[in-house]
């Protein structure tokens, strides 16, 4: 997480006067290489999106990792005008999504390395709620959720809110969920008292206690 945060901060610092989307991709690729992080960053133009809309997906492949190939791929889905220069706020929003997606997948990589790249389960064939109940996903989402809560509430305030975890799943500030990942994750289950969500809450609490906010990009 510290290294990914450093990458994102360096890209933002090198874009103080604004940068185009293509320039940001170039800077990101260069920074990740300089930090010896092996991942691909791709862009996919989706004309169904408006000119300011985008989202980031990332994927980890245990087989590629085992074969010493690039194990993580980050894909930015967008419909950006290539000539538009982004300001600091837009750059920060973009890099935040890059940071979150990359940290999530590097957690999966650590999980995979720990079990010597043995595939844990056939995620593609599972119903989505069963996929989310996978221990690997619970652990990775706990990190992602803890990061979002630290951004929106601060670490210690977030820890206090954990006693009302069910309410936290739906909590919004300024019209935005304090943790979009938590809202989306909990929404996949019929009840907020589901055993998977109780386990997730415990994992999030532990992650909040351990996380160093100096290494959360924001």
Model-derived regions, located:
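Long, well-structured alpha-helical subdomains associated
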Residues: 130-133, 144-218
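Amphipathic, interaction-prone secondary-structure segments
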Residues: 29-62
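Post-HEXXH active-site segment of zinc metalloproteases
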Residues: 96, 112-138
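Glycine-rich, acidic and aromatic/proline-enriched surface loops and short helix-turn segments
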Residues: 108, 112-116, 146-149
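Hydrophobic/basic alpha-helical segments
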Residues: 5-8
């Amino acid at each position: 997480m510290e290294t990914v945060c450093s990458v994102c901060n360096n890209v933002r610092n090198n874009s103080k006067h604004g940068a185009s989307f293509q320039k940001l991709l170039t800077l990101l690729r260069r920074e990740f290489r300089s930090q010896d992080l092996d991942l691909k960053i791709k862009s996919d133009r989706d004309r169904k999106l408006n000119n300011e809309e985008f989202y980031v997906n990332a994927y980890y492949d245990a087989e590629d990792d085992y074969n010493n190939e690039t194990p993580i791929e980050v894909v930015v889905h967008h419909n950006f005008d290539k000539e538009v220069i982004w300001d600091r706020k837009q750059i920060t929003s973009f890099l935040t999504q890059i940071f979150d997606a990359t940290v999530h997948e590097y957690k999966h990589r650590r999980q995979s390395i720990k079990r010597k790249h043995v595939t844990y389960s056939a995620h593609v064939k599972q119903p989505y709620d069963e996929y989310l109940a996978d221990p690997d996903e619970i652990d990775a989402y706990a990190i992602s959720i803890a990061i979002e809560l630290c951004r929106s509430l601060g670490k210690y305030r977030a820890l206090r809110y954990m006693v009302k975890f069910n309410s936290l799943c739906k909590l919004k500030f300024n019209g935005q969920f304090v943790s979009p990942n938590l809202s989306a994750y909990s929404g996949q289950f019929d009840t907020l008292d589901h055993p998977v969500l109780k386990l997730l809450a415990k994992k999030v609490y532990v992650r909040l206690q351990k996380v160093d906010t100096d290494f959360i990009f924001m």
